[in-house]
Amino acid sequence: MKRILDGMKRTMMAVNPPRYTALEGLQKAETASPFKILIGTVLSARTKDENTTKAAKALFKVYGTPQKLANAKVKDVEKMIKSVGFYHVKSKRIIEVAKLLISKYGGKVPADIDQLVEIPGVGRKTANCVLVYAFEQPAIPVDTHVHRISNRLGLVSTKMPEETEMELRKNIPKKFWLDINNTLSLIHI
């Protein structure tokens, strides 16, 4: 497994400029925070990485904390994130998430999958992304790309992303979990 992941990473880094997913970009940013990773992950659903990055940069220039975003007007947020898919729905959702983080978690993003999936709009994939990119906790975020590539590589034989996550968790040593999503997600670019 290490050989496969290392080979894929080397290939992606050989491209000039090297390729990164939007979430890895958020993670590496000087102003990275669990809040920005969570909101960036919500924005990234069904959206190309370059559009997620564009929207996240615009959004976080003005609304970089849960407190600021919780007080935002939906129309103002919509203008900033217009490049992402379903921006009308996501604008309302991320404001709702910011308000919930303040009321339930004191403005902090929980580092627990069970608490994360209780947040509206946060499923296992988003929760696992937050664990990996915000808290560097071993988890396996599985989206449609990771699901498809895992099946094509013969790592799993599953029908649904949730099944893929569980099979990968069984079959891949935990020490590789942090790299799986980012490495396999880059293959589809």
Regions found by a protein language model. Give the residues of each.
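Catalytic DNA-binding helix-loop module of base-excision-repair DNA glycosylases/AP lyases
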Residues: 38-43, 94-100, 108-155, 161-167, ...
